[in-house]
Structures are given as structure tokens and as C-alpha cells.
Amino acid sequence: MTNKRQEFYKTEDIIAEFKQYLKDSDKFDIVTVVGEGEPTLAANLGELVVALKALTDKPVAVITNGALLSDPQVREELCHADMVLPSLDAYNQEISKKIDRPYGTIKFEEEFEGLKKFTHMYEGELWLEIMLVDGINDDEQSILKFQELLKELKYDRLYLNTPVRPPAEADVNVVSEERMRYAVETLGGISIEMMSSGAFFSE
């Protein structure tokens, strides 16, 4: 694991693959940059987004956990994307450690401050996601704390999610419908439909 930015794959190699894909199909609505890990760790992220946008008129989106938004360079590079989907799964350092398990010296306060700065400078479409985990950040007090943080952010949509794929920890469970409903009503978010029958899976 690392929180140091580096070039994992050359921009020209990724673009070459994308050009090949475009030859075979144009049936897509959006180009999403997700990476095998956290995409903002890629030192050539901004260069990649600009290169992708030059090849298609479809929007280019970046999905990020937001851990590196405290870095001004990362914020600047993300501004090239048409859409950015950052996550906000915690409201303090303790909850952040339980859910996101930040690597190294990443501090929640710095991460949130970076997110706040980015949401106010970004001119594209920003969709925020909160991952609610049973018994960790889904109680009434937690939801109210999220509500206070959201007042400081500028975003277009808020999605509320809960683990539906096998998580790293076996005791991580989906939140109840009652808790999710309360979160939706309190935060004004959109609940991502849960499909669960005792196990974690998604469509």
C-alpha cells in the first residue's frame, strides 16, 4: 500500500487501449476513471483525463475516496474531469479508521478540508457518496454529524450506499431499511438500491 503519487501506467499506453476500444464500439455513455486502487494516486491523472476528453465527446468521470484531496495538485487535476464522485464515509478520525482504514499519516480533518475546498472550486458535476455501515456510522447521532458536514460542501447529488459486495471484514453488515430511510430523509440523499439476501452481492 502507498499514499505516494506515482505513474503506475503510462498515459500513452492507456490512451492506446482506449483508441482501440473506440474502433470496436461507441456504445457507452461515460468514461469512468477508477483504477485498480485509488485513481488520484496516479501522478499522471490530470494528463490522462485531458487526453481522454480529447478523444470523445462523452463525459469523463473520476471516482475517488477523496483521501488525497488535501493536495492542491490533485484538486487541480480533478478539475479537468466532467464529473467527480468522491466519498465521505466518516465524520471524524475514529470513524475514518474503522471504515476507510486510511494509510499512513492521512488525517480526516485534512481530507475533509481538501474535499470542501474542491467542492467550492470545481465547476463540473459532483456526486457525493456516503457509505453507511451497520453499527459504525448509521445511528442517529452519526447521521446528524454528517448533516452538519454536508452544509459545508457544494455538490449536485448525494448517494447513500451500504456494503453489497464482500467487504474486507466479515462482520461488516448492511444497514437496516429503517436506518437507511432515516438517513435519506435527514440528509436529502438518494439510496442506492440494496439487493441482499443474507450475502453481499450487486448487479
Tell me the role of every PLM-derived stretch:
Residues M1-D13:
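Canonical Radical SAM [4Fe-4S] cluster-binding loop centered on the CxxxCxxC motif
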Residues T2-N3, V33, S96-I99:
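Short amphipathic alpha-helical segments at helix-loop
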Residues D13-E36, M195:
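Short Fe-S-cluster ligation motifs
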Residues K19, K53, K151, R181-G188:
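Class I S-adenosyl-L-methionine
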Residues T40-V175:
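Conserved AdoMet/S-adenosylmethionine-binding subsite of the radical SAM
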Residues L128, A168-F200:
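Short acidic, glycine/proline-enriched helix-loop-strand junctions
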